Amino acid sequence: MTGVCVAKPVLVDTCVWVEHVHREVDVLRRLCAESRALIHPDVRGEVMLGCGEERDLLVKRLRLLPGIDRPPQVDIESLVQQHAIACKRVGWVDAVLLCTAMIDPRRPAVLTFDRRLLREAIRLGVAFAG
């Protein structure tokens, strides 16, 4: 019997997209080429709040990516409590990304350059491992 290995989708954090605007991020380019990069609505919103010439083009490109649904607020709040995400010095959008990765049936990994978010993603077993 032959097993089929399906590469996991990856939920990409805002800081990775911002860095990609300034200098190409190879891993992100590869994930996009493999159709594995997912865009979260809150990340797209954060990118929209940015400025610069590249912002409009990036927002247009992000709209072309496969999306991921935002879990209900009550589920996010429950996971924040259950997994002790509070007091870890991550922001709310970061906590939402972590919870989304844990709830979504595809179990996407989280790709970030943010140290605190990465630490929590590793702790919760949802960090992108390359």
Predicted segments — roles?
Residues 1-42, 48-60, 123-127:
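Short, well-structured N-terminal submotif of metal-dependent ribonuclease cores
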